[in-house]
Amino acid sequence: MKYDDNNIFAKILRGEIPCKKIYENDYVLSFYDVNPQKKIHALVIPKGQYTDLDDFVQNAKEKEIYEFFKAISHVAKMLKVSNVDGGYRTLSNIANNGGQEVPH
């Protein structure tokens, strides 16, 4: 699957669509979902052009991968849902059969 520069996450990363930012560094952006499925529903997305988690893990630099997963833990602590606060769930929808709606 080819990366689409006009997907909603790419537009959020470029600042064309606003988001309620939680955390950002050189590699990731985290923000609240506009249609939350739970009381706390945060997204953590890489800033690189990857279509899904498989593409990211296979093609990103080790530093990008490290910073992505480190950011997930950091955001969980910020939102007070880390393992010491009761826990959280991570989810990545991959491709059509995995329920992916936006290829990013």
Question: Predicted segment positions?
Answer:
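HIT superfamily nucleotide-processing domains
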Residues: 1-104
